[in-house]
Amino acid sequence: MSEQKSMQILNEADTAQYIGMSRAWLRLARTRRIGPPYIRIASSIRYAVPDLDKFLETHRVTPKQITRN
């Protein structure tokens, strides 16, 4: 028998808390296709934690270093 990797899956409420956004934003982001990847099982929406981590990393902004004379 082969081993399967376990992936943590979150519902919409837990996802909103995980990424610091509202559930309403997640719904809007899904309709506009600008949010994190999601899994649809029947009428349930779920998010994989590795996908959320990647989504957050791609939106990281690193400010430029200010040099003073």
What do the PLM-derived regions correspond to, one by one?
Residues 50-69:
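A short, Lys/Arg-enriched interface patch at domain edges and termini
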